[in-house]
Regions:
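Immediate flanking context of iron-sulfur cluster ligation sites
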Residues: 120-129, 173-180
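A structural signal for short secondary-structure junctions
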Residues: 84-85, 97, 125, 159-163
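Short amphipathic, charge-patterned alpha-helical segments
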Residues: 107-123
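Short, ordered loop/turn segments at secondary-structure junctions
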Residues: 15-16, 136, 172
Length: 180
């Protein structure tokens, strides 16, 4: 790794894929070949995790940031984002939007910027109704909050959450009762 003389083996395993496996101890249980159910804590995974060994689990986005932070320094990373939510966030932009796909923006970017400047706006001249963040556990953000800076605290304050970065745009034709 970076000509350090250090190397290691990496095993990639498929888990059960159940929604509950987003919880770290349920994911470990699934990787071990068992039903993906959360484990009681303590012990915490850093002490006794996968196969009863110390384990660090993070999402791919977190691990992808590490090389750039090592190369550029923590101050570089902290120079992006907001006071409480540093760095960038990857979103999977979908729904009623011209430009769907993965995008990475600094924390603090507004929902309006993501939808209209990056996403290209709503097709067919339709009006924006809401955006869902945080997946099934998140919430729907109405038009009155389009200019709120996106970060962990602000999303929670308006009844949603960041989650893993899903961002689904809805237009005037979406029925919020059906969405719920």
């Amino acid at each position: 790794i970076f000509d350090s003389g250090f190397d290691f083996d990496l095993d990639i395993r498929l888990g059960a894929g159940a929604f509950v496996c987003g919880e770290e101890t349920a994911l470990m249980t699934s990787i071990e070949g068992n039903r993906g159910e959360p484990r009681p804590r303590p012990p915490f995974p850093a002490e006794s995790g996968l196969f009863k060994k110390p384990t660090v689990l993070n999402n791919v986005e977190t691990y992808a940031n590490i090389p750039q932070i090592i190369l550029n320094g923590a101050d570089w990373f902290a120079s992006m984002g907001t006071e409480k939510s540093k760095g960038t966030k990857v979103f999977a932009l979908g729904g009623k939007i011209h430009n769907t796909g993965l995008l990475e923006v600094p924390m603090g970017t507004t929902l309006r910027e993501v939808i209209y400047e990056i996403g290209g706006g709503i097709p067919n001249g339709k009006a924006f109704k809401a955006a869902q963040t945080g997946g099934p556990s998140g919430g729907c953000i109405p038009a009155e909050h389009l200019d709120i800076p996106i970060d962990y605290d602000n999303l929670i304050a308006i009844g949603s959450m960041m989650g893993s970065g899903g961002l689904i745009v809805m237009d005037e034709d979406n029925c919020m009762v059906d969405i719920a």
